[in-house]
């Protein structure tokens, strides 16, 4: 799916092709035709090994329907005789507000740096899934050097004790800020927050697979980059920095930071 976190976009679009691995994006995770078309376009080029999605998407909060992905993969298996592995970047809502594996997705991927770590003091990632799939990942982990150091592992274990409390409080605070921005009388803004998307299909997916809205959202300002940075520089409480899920309130301009490595035409297509 697209958009993805900027680092993931760079991995899929720039690094994996150097290893002979290609990708076929779809932008609307609520549209069966787009998912089917992406699967068939990828299959025409070779074996489809992985369907990788991120929902809600960073930074637009676009959704991908888990049930739709599962049905599309079942139909693909009926046509082609095999089923690609599915994986979801669940960083934005998980592991508290969304559970992809319970909805038919094979692997759930996390930046543990964010909400799970929760204090902006470590860099880590995690993946959950069946014993068979995790066993395959463990077999290659040593070759890629992705073992986490003991101290960071201890800090993650420490942070998980307060994860539910932190995520619920952050989500409640973000909801108040998002609604104030959307309703403020000074300047009308488009606020990309799950509670403020009026599309019935979007809200149906929210009700079905999300138990909360999370605390990361975006706003759309007229005036381009200059207006965005005037807004950022005028804030007093929010710090201009990348990342999310910590105890501080942060704001950033994605096109200049997290998604700066994504080609401009791709950013324009997905609204970043």
Placement of each model-derived feature along the sequence:
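Conserved C-terminal alpha-helix-loop-beta "cap" of PLP-dependent enzymes
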Residues: 188-272
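Conserved PLP-enzyme active-site core in the AAT-like
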Residues: 1-187, 192
